């Protein structure tokens, strides 16, 4: 009986972990902070920063895109790490 209960506990923990979805901030520049659940098995959040005629611009989201010269990017792997 104890073995059965222990087995069920382990299976429950493993199944709950398989449904995990990374959560990243996705607001742009000075917008109100918002978050989104990443899809497609994304394992990274990013924060991209660059300067244009309006000043510094910031973009946040899921993934870790490649960027052009002059654009600063920080990628991370934990929930809401890209604030």
Curated annotation (Swiss-Prot):
Gene Ontology MF term list? acetylcholine receptor inhibitor activity; ion channel regulator activity; toxin activity
Instruction: Identify the PROSITE patterns for this entry.
Output: SNAKE_TOXIN (PS00272)
UniProt cross-references to CDD domains, sorted A to Z: TFP_snake_toxin
**Disulfide connectivity?**
24-45, 38-62, 64-75, 76-81
What Gene3D superfamilies does the record point to?
CD59
Describe, from its UniProt entry, the tissues in which this protein is expressed. Expressed by the venom gland.
Keyword Ligase assigned to the entry: answer is no
Task: Give GO cellular component annotations, separated by semicolons.
Answer: extracellular region
Which keywords label this protein?
Answer: Acetylcholine receptor inhibiting toxin, Disulfide bond, Ion channel impairing toxin, Neurotoxin, Postsynaptic neurotoxin, Secreted, Signal, Toxin
**Leader sequence segment:** 1-21
Q: Which domain of life is it from?
A: Eukaryota
Entry's localization field? Secreted
Q: Summarize the protein's role.
A: Binds to muscle nicotinic acetylcholine receptor (nAChR) and inhibit acetylcholine from binding to the receptor, thereby impairing neuromuscular transmission.
The UniProt entry's sequence similarity note says: Belongs to the three-finger toxin family. Short-chain subfamily. Type I alpha-neurotoxin sub-subfamily.
- Please identify the protein, giving its name as recorded: Alpha-neurotoxin NTX-3
- Lineage of the species this protein comes from: Eukaryota, Metazoa, Chordata, Craniata, Vertebrata
């Amino acid at each position: 009986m104890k073995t059965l209960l222990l087995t069920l506990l382990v299976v429950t923990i493993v199944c709950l972990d398989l449904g995990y979805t990374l959560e990243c901030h996705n607001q742009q520049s000075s917008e109100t902070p918002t978050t989104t659940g990443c899809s497609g098995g994304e394992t990274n959040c990013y924060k991209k920063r660059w300067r244009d005629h309006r000043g510094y611009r910031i973009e946040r989201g899921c993934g870790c895109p490649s960027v052009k010269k002059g654009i600063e990017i920080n990628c991370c792997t934990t929930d809401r790490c890209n604030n």
